[in-house]
Amino acid sequence: MIIMYAIGIGDNKEEVLKAYEKLKEEGIEVELIDNPKLLVDKLLDGEIDGAVRGSLSSSKVILYLRERIGKFYRASILKNPFTNGIFLLSPVGIDDISEDKNERIKDKIRIIEFASNFLKNYNIKAKVAVLSGGRLGDLGRNKVVDETIYEAEEIVEHFKGNVDIIHNGILIEEYLKDGYNIIIAVDGITGNLIFRCLGLICKIPGYGAVILSDKNVNFIDTSRNANWERYYNAIKFLIGGDFG
């Protein structure tokens, strides 16, 4: 039997094994791999069609993947609790975008372009919401917040007239209620925290984080603290591109 997909198994073995058994019940054979480099190499060398990080260490898998394919970004696919559609949240990797302001803006612009193309592949029109650190009326209260507001406005201006894009401060709940499907976090730390609050604490369903890159890499990043459903959903998405 040819095995076309693999899941990394490190910490949190029990949840990975639950996903593995559930997939097996459905006739889907998945290889479990405990070596980060082997997981990446098998994917990029064409031995498997898709890979899920599973519960392997991010610092090992992601750094090695970056060595192999160069720069990329990650976008978590989550269910919108208000619309039942999906949305992409990015950046979610703590080192996905630059600490330098100008480079950070360029990174976010690239993320929006990649994420818009990703949704287009599923016949979903991109609606982009850029987060900043406070309400627009908070301008002048905190220098760090002010910078995030100015940065968000600069990004919106870049796409003006070409992309359905909005900046209305920190109000992520309003963006989601209005059906925005690409949420751009202030930085990777903020994005990671949002994902953990929504996905791991509030249990909003998700499919892992896709790779946003100029290369076609069939890899899904997942948290090592996820429950079995996230690993299961990631494999199902790789197989059929179905958001369930």
UniProtKB/Swiss-Prot annotation:
Record key words, sorted: Methyltransferase, Transferase
NCBIfam families associated with the record: methan_mark_4 (TIGR03270)
Official protein name in the record: Uncharacterized methyltransferase MJ1371
Domain of life: Archaea
One BP term from GO: methylation
A molecular function (GO) term: methyltransferase activity
Similarity annotation: Belongs to the MtxX family.
Enzyme class: transferase
Source species taxonomy: Archaea, Methanobacteriati, Methanobacteriota, Methanomada group, Methanococci
InterPro entries hit by this protein: MeTrfase_MtxX_xsu (IPR016764)
Keyword Cell cycle belongs to the record: no
Source organism of this protein record: Methanocaldococcus jannaschii (strain ATCC 43067 / DSM 2661 / JAL-1 / JCM 10045 / NBRC 100440) (Methanococcus jannaschii)
